[in-house]
Amino acid sequence: MTNIRKSHPLTKIINNSFIDLPTPSSISSWWNFGSLLGICLAVQILTGLFLAMHYTADTATAFNSVTHICRDVNYGWILRYMHANGASMFFICLYLHVGRGLYYGSYTYTETWNVGIMLLFAVMATAFMGYVLPWGQMSFWGATVITNLLSAIPYIGTNLVEWIWGGFSVDKATLTRFFAFHFILPFIISAMVMVHLLFLHETGSNNPTGIPSNMDMIPFHPYHTIKDILGLLLMLTALLVLVMFSPDLLGDPDNYIPANPLNTPPHIKPEWYFLFAYAILRSIPNKLGGVLALVLSILILAIIPLLHTSKQRSMMFRPISQCLFWLLVADMLTLTWIGGQPVEHPYIIIGQLASILYFSIILIFMPLASLTENHLLXW
């Protein structure tokens, strides 16, 4: 008799995805972040669902409803801070996941990579809209500044912005629609995750060497399930330490001031995970140019498979490319720091140089380094 796990139409899908899935034996802990992202998504959907039961998407009561959740709802404070800091963990895992893909050449699985880029955009949109919901000062002004960027689009820009706002400024209509979108997007993201996994399981996982590992596979369960659980425990420990000891560490104090359209905060800035893109946006003195640079800073990931000039897939045995990769990481950290600083000397010039370096590394230096390495190996 066949095992029901392998014969039943529903359990068969789960079995082939998480239990009997052939996995390379050599994949390191950098491959844990996919499962961690799945868990982050589940945590965000669950905490978000319970928060939505007590939240009101109305400009008059939104700020007070969040205060009510923290003060009066049973364990509301932990729900709120798990959700807010869970977003930070989500982005830490996301950036590490993308970095892993860049380093080990996982982007050569173009379908999986492109769905991943769409997922990144969807998660960024969701996080931005979620940041608007508490209706504090930074929520309101962040929404105003970021939606206003669309007015840089020639001809249709102004109409587009007013259409998104549902009026002539960020107001009740904007908050209501942002709540609706913030609620629905995670479920769309969940469906996209399925597509992401579908494409991944067509090819199988990459591994640190970048060499096909068809002759050396092990079942996903129990080996990688145990390994993923270790990663999960470490991530949950970090998240709970953050939530219990310093829940406001990554937030902005200005968001504890109710939104006031008549009073602009001294430094309008997004959450820390968008600061690198915000720094690139600010470093170009032209509005349309800045918006294009902002979009391209993420969209540039889509052309990385086309820029792969190396004869090797992974960077494991390519020291010049490795140096450039870590320079890119340092550059992104620099941009993140600059994004949180005021627009004044010397931060302006540092931001501009870091932005130029960001695009130069990806578009020019990395492809050239790969060609150089090919030449040095006499390939």
UniProtKB/Swiss-Prot annotation:
Co-factor note (free text): Binds 2 heme b groups non-covalently.
GO cellular component, one term: mitochondrial inner membrane
Compartments, record wording: Mitochondrion inner membrane
Cofactor(s), names only, from the UniProt record: heme b
Principal localisation: mitochondrion
Membrane topology: Multi-pass membrane protein
UniProt GO MF annotations: metal ion binding; ubiquinol-cytochrome-c reductase activity
Sites where the protein binds a ubiquinone: 201
PROSITE patterns the record matches: CYTB_CTER (PS51003), CYTB_NTER (PS51002)
Residue numbers binding heme b b562: 83, 182
Pfam families according to UniProt: Cytochrom_B_C, Cytochrome_B
Keyword field: Electron transport, Heme, Iron, Membrane, Metal-binding, Mitochondrion, Mitochondrion inner membrane, Respiratory chain, Transmembrane, Transmembrane helix, Transport, Ubiquinone
InterPro entries: Cyt_b/b6_C, Cyt_b/b6_C_sf, Cyt_b/b6_N, Cytb/b6-like_sf, Cytochrome_b, Cytochrome_b_C_euk/bac, Cytochrome_b_N_euk/bac, Di-haem_cyt_TM
UniProt entry tagged with the keyword Transmembrane helix: yes
Subunit composition and interactions: The cytochrome bc1 complex contains 11 subunits: 3 respiratory subunits (MT-CYB, CYC1 and UQCRFS1), 2 core proteins (UQCRC1 and UQCRC2) and 6 low-molecular weight proteins (UQCRH/QCR6, UQCRB/QCR7, UQCRQ/QCR8, UQCR10/QCR9, UQCR11/QCR10 and a cleavage product of UQCRFS1). This cytochrome bc1 complex then forms a dimer.
Additional free-text comment from the UniProt record: Heme 1 (or BL or b562) is low-potential and absorbs at about 562 nm, and heme 2 (or BH or b566) is high-potential and absorbs at about 566 nm.
Described purpose of this protein according to its UniProt entry: Component of the ubiquinol-cytochrome c reductase complex (complex III or cytochrome b-c1 complex) that is part of the mitochondrial respiratory chain. The b-c1 complex mediates electron transfer from ubiquinol to cytochrome c. Contributes to the generation of a proton gradient across the mitochondrial membrane that is then used for ATP synthesis.
Protein name per its UniProtKB record: Cytochrome b
Native source organism of the sequence: Natalus tumidirostris
Taxonomic lineage: Eukaryota, Metazoa, Chordata, Craniata, Vertebrata
